Amino acid sequence: KDGSLLHADIPDLAYREDSNHRRMHASQIEADDCFYGFGEKSGEINKAEKYMNMAPGDAMGYNAKETDSLYKHIPFYIKLNRGTKQAVGYFYHNTAECDFNMGREKRNYWHRYSTYRTDAGDVDLFLIAGPSIRDIIERYTDLTGKSVMLPKAALGYLGSSMYYPELPENSDDAVLEFIDTTHEEDIPGIGAVGRN
């Protein structure tokens, strides 16, 4: 609305394909841009200067600061410029494994940039104008669908089994202790996610 530039491609790098037929998109970024989203990711919430792999899989040896990648990978993020307070959303409509480089790589020949690279499919990008993060989330969920509110009985605690197999010993006892604790603390709707 105010004439601010929300997005620019990098000339000569914008859309390309490498020798392994992976398709890439390069976007201009600024030093004071912040990047939020990407689905389930560990580490700092602002992913500026981070490299992220997007592939569902078990994260054995999980580290809350650095583990990548986790199960829920969503090729959507919001770029927020700290100076202008302008935000824009990027949704890459592709379910293939991919990765994002959010300015970690710097070159002398081009303006600062981020890259999206997909192992299969096309670069099918939806740019979602702000100006606010709230506006972008509203428009993104208009596009992808909104979650319905679950009944109260379904809003209990859901535990993950990722922690228990990595215990040095007595992992079965730890699971049973967790269940006992939830009963003692009157935590309803206990569920657990795991793999055999």
Label for each model-derived stretch:
Residues 189-191:
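Reverse-transcribing Pol proteins
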Residues 1-167, 171-174, 179-184:
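Catalytic and substrate-binding clefts that recognize carbohydrates or anionic sugar/phosphate headgroups
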Residues 76, 194-195:
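Active-site and adjacent substrate-binding regions of carbohydrate-active enzymes
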